[in-house]
């Protein structure tokens, strides 16, 4: 895949739609080979490739740094967990998987309530849903939960006076991620994984026709 021709918006869209259930890459692979890029275009290509390939490792890194920064502030730590959950809801596969598991659990106690949590019926025109991009969680659009969790986390951060620590932790983790993604040399496994994800995306679009 030619990452030079991939825009930042395309990377964000791919991260939103890709499966996040895959385990993180091993430490041996994560810290394997490092080298500085030879040009600005090479740096941009490597940065986008590594952000996509090591996405799970970077997400765990952010959670770990936030946990260290807020270990003495339990309320702010809960706020950070809510923020991580709201960010995870932005991913299609996570939101759909969470919705199914939560409704399945509720069904054991109240089938009637679980039925109400099902997403509304989407009209289909020529084999395609008119709202294919709309993802529902417990019968509500996922942005409702994203905004609710983000608001609750901000309230907890202000209440615990941990907002400054959160900013420090986020900036630190962001700096570490950018440095690692910039100097980590993409290996053959990363390129093969990219081709596999491309094939899955094409096959998914074909199956929806």
Swiss-Prot record:
It is a multi-pass membrane protein. Keywords: Endosome, Membrane, Transmembrane, Transmembrane helix, Transport. One of its GO terms (cellular component) is endoplasmic reticulum. It is found in: Endosome membrane. Its main location: membrane. Pfam families: PRA1. The chain crosses the membrane at residues 51-72, 76-98, 142-162, 163-183. GO terms for biological process: vesicle-mediated transport. The keyword Transmembrane helix applies. The keyword rRNA-binding does not apply. Coiled coil: none annotated. InterPro entries: Prenylated_rab_accept_PRA1. May be involved in both secretory and endocytic intracellular trafficking in the endosomal/prevacuolar compartments. Belongs to the PRA1 family. This is PRA1 family protein A2. It comes from Arabidopsis thaliana. The gene is PRA1A2.
